[in-house]
Amino acid sequence: MISWFIPVFAIVFVSWYFIVIFNRLVRLDNERKNAFSQISVQLKRRYDLIPNLVETAKAYLKHENQTLESVINARDHAEATRREANKSPTPQALGELMGAEAILGGALGGLFAVVESYPDLKADQTMGRLHEELVSTENRVAFARQAFNDAVMVYNTRRESFPDVLLAKMGGFQEAILWDEISQNERVSVKVSF
């Protein structure tokens, strides 16, 4: 009687252990996806501020249409890329979003460089309020990125640890990329000052 009990117990135990590992990987993957969605929420907030910023600047920057158009085009591209990444936050989609964010950062940097040469615009109350909102949103985005990177590190560490690595490969759990894994050349910091 004991001869059949040990193999059955071993099979049940190993099956149970694999279920626990699989569920842990699913939970960590979902936490990573949730952390990305927090970035997405803050980026959406940022993208929603930009048209107001451009409209406020438009009254003062009549001869800077190219600058304003580049900001709006970069914003629209980043928003479309964000929506695609929301559907499926794959490493490729996140890489495209990071690239779109770098382009938008460069366009915003150009806008704020132009704003510096217009004292009336710098003194505008609406522009000041939008500037404060943008700075606050940038801080929220930075915090969300940090939380995302933390979730990615936990997920990747677990995914690459034995015995989880065996089930991760069979279960299709792909390595996640950190938000900051873009080249130094693509990074453009948005400097806003009034």
Regions found by a protein language model. Give the residues of each.
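A helix-centric hydrophobic-segment signal that preferentially recognizes long
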Residues: M1-F194
